[in-house]
Amino acid sequence: MKLRLDKYLADMGIGTRTEVKKAIIKGQVRVNEETVKRPEIKIDTEKDHVFYQGKPVAYAEYEYYMLNKPAGVVSATEDKNDRTVLELIEEKQRKDLFPVGRLDKDTEGLLLITNDGELAHQLLSPKKHVDKVYFARIDGKVTEEDIRRFAEGLEIGEEKPTLPAYLEILETEEISEIRLTIREGKFHQVKRMFHAVGKEVIYLKRLQMGSLVLDPQLALGEYRELTGQELEALRDCSSLR
């Protein structure tokens, strides 16, 4: 892919187009072994080597991060009142990243951060029915009857019932622990489903989205780039090849 030098640097977060143009004109940018002072020259992202103030700037058209979202941050690109998930991604190069879908402010777990709009669309499309797996603690005893009702679909105040969901009881006491697989992503869906059977979610964590499984080595608030294998599997499960 070929890009103007100023766009290349702006895309990689060096600064605004105006700022990087000034840096180029001042001689702070080298392409391969030559200092370049023309912002408009074309860069081949696959062949050329760009340096800013002596440091290499590799071009990444898309970035993909797995985040273990902590409670207390919001799934948004910006927010006036709360810290956002993007503020946790300190090593990001691009400024156009966004969370794929959303987790409630008090919900923890797997969140994909990227700037790949086509992949995000495929993963979130209601036509794709990409599985999402959650662990939850529930106030009250979860029963076999609840399993049956979840499998049939529940009325949660929408035009249609939820799609069949797979509910697995891990522990059933006054505070139950469960694992739930749903195939859609309605607003507050897990909480509303349990409310429909007379119970309340007191803790919620997403473990998996499609083929992407939360890395158990990631502490809350930590993130890492997706591996090539993880990205390929995600594209497979969303039929994006």
Protein language model regions, located:
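Basic, flexible Lys/Arg- and Gly-enriched helix-loop patches that mediate nucleic-acid binding at interfaces
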Residues: K2-R241
